């Protein structure tokens, strides 16, 4: 970053529509949130027990202009004051992504602004920069509905995925187990709440995989829970949902936290970041804080709940980093539902 760039304020509008939240935000200098507007569609998807892509896209089309206008108004800035427009280009639902990408392209073209395509997971990681300055090398544990990854970073924009899920993401497992327990969608917060009322007394598997692997696997655990519930029902017995929630969460959290701390030791990082929607989970936050006591010299950064779930402030922050590195997209930018991080 040059001297001139350091002295000039940088204002970036972020836009996020990768799944079921329509979001826009204005961030100053990659550190100060001037506005962060999120229109959630949760109620529309709840009765279906999951996100319906077609419904998500329609809601984004209805909301996108209003959400962007509100973000600009709350921030008290004009389009003339902006330095760039950053938008989630992937991964996500293709129809949902297209709404945000096309809105960003239209704004960039109309106002002569640089356009920046941002990876959704990079956004989740960079949400932490709104809490603390990033110190490299660092390790990020990204846990969301569709992703469970350990990402090592040597410097800004340099991502190495050292561990990822081989089947279900942690968030998917939460939703499927919640459904089996008769809990509403989205299941994560409900399991977290029940887990705090129960004890992890049910013996459930933990998939450590082969020695030295930082990958994750949650499908076996999910199947074990579903089988236990099914077998109990066949026998005419009832399993206390609080004990099952506590046991399931203990298994997920144990593997996530143990592998994260092992990797932090091996890669000799200065900082560990928690990122993604499941990062809002109280059980995970508490367990990671406790286990990180083994590494007193490593800083643990956990974003506030509002920055864990999908939002556009994180996209604006990641976009600011790319802007300052001179990286730009052109008007051929397209939505990529399976965009790789690396």
From Swiss-Prot:
Positions that bind substrate: 142-146, 175, 188, 192, 281
Subcellular location: Cytoplasm
Domain of life: Bacteria
E.C. designation(s): 2.3.1.234
Keyword set includes Acyltransferase: yes
Keywords attached to this entry: Acyltransferase, Cytoplasm, Iron, Metal-binding, Transferase, tRNA processing
GO BP terms, alphabetized: tRNA threonylcarbamoyladenosine modification
The protein's required cofactors: Fe(2+)
Acyltransferase is among the record's keywords: yes
Family annotation (InterPro entries): ATPase_NBD (IPR043129), Gcp-like_dom (IPR000905), KAE1/TsaD (IPR017861), Peptidase_M22_CS (IPR017860), TsaD (IPR022450)
Transmembrane domains' residue ranges: none
Note accompanying the cofactor annotation: Binds 1 Fe(2+) ion per subunit.
Any one GO molecular-function label of the UniProt entry: N(6)-L-threonylcarbamoyladenine synthase activity
Entry binding sites for Fe cation: 120, 124, 310
Cystine bridges: none
GO cellular component: cytoplasm
Pfam family, one: TsaD
Catalytic activity: L-threonylcarbamoyladenylate + adenosine(37) in tRNA = N(6)-L-threonylcarbamoyladenosine(37) in tRNA + AMP + H(+)
Family affiliation: Belongs to the KAE1 / TsaD family.
Role according to the record: Required for the formation of a threonylcarbamoyl group on adenosine at position 37 (t(6)A37) in tRNAs that read codons beginning with adenine. Is involved in the transfer of the threonylcarbamoyl moiety of threonylcarbamoyl-AMP (TC-AMP) to the N6 group of A37, together with TsaE and TsaB. TsaD likely plays a direct catalytic role in this reaction.
Protein name per its UniProtKB record: tRNA N6-adenosine threonylcarbamoyltransferase
Organism annotation: Geobacillus kaustophilus (strain HTA426)
């Amino acid at each position: 970053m040059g001297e001139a760039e350091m002295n000039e304020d940088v204002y970036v509008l972020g836009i996020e529509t990768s799944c079921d939240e329509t979001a826009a935000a204005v961030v100053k200098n990659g550190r100060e949130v001037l506005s962060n507007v999120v229109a959630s569609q949760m109620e529309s998807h709840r009765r279906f027990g999951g996100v319906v892509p077609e419904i998500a896209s329609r809601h984004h089309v209805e909301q996108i202009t209003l959400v962007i206008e509100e973000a600009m108004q709350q921030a008290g800035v004009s389009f003339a004051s902006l330095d760039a427009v950053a938008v989630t280009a992937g991964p996500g639902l293709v129809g949902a992504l297209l709404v945000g990408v096309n809105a960003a392209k239209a704004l960039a073209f109309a106002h002569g602004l640089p356009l920046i395509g941002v990876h959704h997971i990079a956004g989740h990681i960079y949400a932490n920069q709104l809490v603390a300055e990033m110190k490299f090398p660092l390790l990020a544990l990204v846990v969301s509905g569709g992703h469970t990854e350990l990402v090592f970073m040597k410097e800004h924009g340099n991502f190495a995925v050292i561990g990822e899920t081989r089947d279900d993401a942690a968030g998917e497992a939460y939703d499927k187990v919640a459904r089996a327990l008769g809990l509403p969608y989205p299941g994560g917060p409900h399991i977290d709440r029940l887990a705090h009322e129960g004890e992890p007394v049910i013996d459930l598997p933990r998939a450590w995989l082969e020695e030295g692997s930082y990958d994750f696997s949650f499908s076996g655990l999910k199947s074990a829970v579903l089988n236990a519930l099914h077998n109990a029902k066949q026998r005419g017995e009832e399993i206390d949902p609080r004990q099952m929630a506590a046991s399931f969460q203990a298994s997920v959290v144990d593997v996530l936290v143990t592998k994260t701390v092992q990797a932090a030791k091996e890669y000799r990082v200065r900082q560990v970041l928690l990122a993604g929607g499941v990062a809002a989970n109280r059980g995970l936050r508490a367990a990671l804080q406790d286990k990180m006591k083994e590494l007193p010299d490593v800083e643990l950064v956990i974003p506030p709940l509002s920055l864990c779930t999908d939002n556009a402030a994180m996209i604006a922050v990641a976009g600011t980093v790319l802007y300052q590195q001179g990286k730009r997209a052109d008007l051929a930018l397209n939505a990529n539902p399976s965009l790789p991080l690396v």
